[in-house]
Each structure stands twice: as C-alpha cells, then as structure tokens.
C-alpha cells in the first residue's frame, strides 16, 4: 500500500513537470526577445543604424520608398550649400569668382520654394553647381568644423549631376545619407539568428532626452553611438560645448546608471571614415589637450576608446563591448551587428539560466 503512487500524486507530478516545461519554454522565449535601445548624442549615426537594419534584415527600401526620400535629398543638398554660403560671411571668406555673389543671391531666392515643393529645378541646380565649384566656397567647406554642416554635404554636392536629373530615384546609399532630426522614439522590429529584435531609436538632442526614460524597462542591451569625427565640433544646441565632451558626459550617465546594472552596453565609435580623413589636419588636442600621441587614426581612435571605457565605474563586473563603425557602410554594419548579436545571445542565455 505504502509503495503505491496515488492518482493525486501522479497528477501533481505531471503538473510539476508541465510547470517546469512552461518555465523553460518561457525562459527560451524570453531569451529570444531582444529589446535594443539606441542612445547617443545628436548626429551620432543612430538613425543610420536603424536604416541599415532595414537594408540588412528587411530586404531594404523598395523603389517607391526610395522615391519618398527624394525631397529629403534635395532639402539636405540645398541646406548644405546654404550653410556654407552663410558661413562665408561669418568667416570673411570671399568668392574665388566675384560673379558667384549673384549666384548666392539667386540661391536664397530659389531655395525656399524648391524646398517647400520638394523639387530641384534646373536653374537652382546650375546655381548650386557653379557655387560648389568656386574656390572660395571650397575653402569655406574645408573649415566646416567652425560652423554646423551636415556630414552628407560633400556626398550630395559632388553628385549633383545625378541628383538633379529629371528621372532621379534615390539609391539605398542616398537614403542612408539623408539627415532628418529624430524627434520622439522610432521603433523597428526584425528577426535575426532566431532572435526577435525590437530596436528603439531615441532623439539625441538635449531637448529629446527626457523622453527616453520610459523606454528603459526590460532593455536587453544598449547600443551607444559616438561620432568619432565630432571631436573638433561644438553642439548645434550649445556652441560652448564640445560634442565629444557632451557624448562622454552622456555615456557616463548611461553606463553607470543603476537601471542598467545588468544591461549589456555596446559602444559604437562611429563615423570612423570621417575621423580618418579629419585627424590628419585637425589635431585631437582640440578636444583632449592632454593628448601627446600622434594624429594618426589608430593611435587617436584608441585614445578615444580608452577615454570612454575608463568612464565605466564597474569594470570588475561590467564589460563594455566596443566596435569601430561606419554606419553608412552596409558590410561594416552587417559584420559588427553579427558580433553584437552573438554577445546578446550569450548574455541572454546566461540571464535565463540556459548557458
């Protein structure tokens, strides 16, 4: 009699097994759901990373979606040349050819209507082409660290012939280069390596930061973007503040925040291509007066990496996963995101007791 297992005991054992199985299934499901928060100061490349996820994991932009970016490409191109011309006045740079002053006046007369209508009329394209070819305009462009200018300025202006054609349809690369300030929170979903990603792109300008906080709960990992090339620039919203210093301040507050004790922090030192071009003629001491190394890519980039990683106050328990990126280079982002995903899988399984 004592050795007989009662029906109640059998049922209880079965219930227990089901609960264990459900818990394990829930754990595995939780391990497959990834909430990624993209953080960083304004213009650090967060939105470009989101666009790359669409290209890499969601079959990219359709022809119709690319067409919808046409007006943004035109606006970015017009705004860029206008910013350079305005800066010439402030920096007291003359046109190489004095007749370009008439073109500048015409630019400002035509620009407003063109932007409102999302078009690039032939007369405006010709004006921009002549201005961009001027030696004085090029001299001002080479001093762009002294004023606010889109990173994509040269990309669009050098390709004006193609962009201004009547049958122009933006390419994926054109779309990647577009700049639209992110306001609020943009959510993207995709699946990769059997993981279901929810990626949140959050506006980086100071006025946007108060909107971040309610996104923080249950975050798997934070990708923090830094524009390496911003070491010699000031903020658009505060011309006294160096952009790299602002980025470091923000990273410090995120990395050492009690909310993120168990959150993987992935650091994207972005715009490495622009940094490599710039470091040769614009010394790192502009940002870090104590720097004594060479103004060469490897040494200077390594120094910036150590400055950010040294902000981590929990080095013994928290690792920062750093990658050098070029957000407009699809192959580079694909390679880096593959490595990031492997880290997330490992850490997720560990958290769920499955590793």
Curated annotation (Swiss-Prot):
Domain of life: Eukaryota
Chain segments carrying region G4 motif: 266-273
Binding site for GTP: 40-47, 176-182, 201-205, 270-273, 327
A UniProt-annotated Pfam family: G-alpha
Subunit structure as annotated in this protein's UniProt entry: G proteins are composed of 3 units; alpha, beta and gamma. The alpha chain contains the guanine nucleotide binding site.
Similarity-based family: Belongs to the G-alpha family. G(i/o/t/z) subfamily.
Protein name (record): Guanine nucleotide-binding protein G(i) subunit alpha-2
Native organism: Gallus gallus
Name of the gene this protein is made from: GNAI2
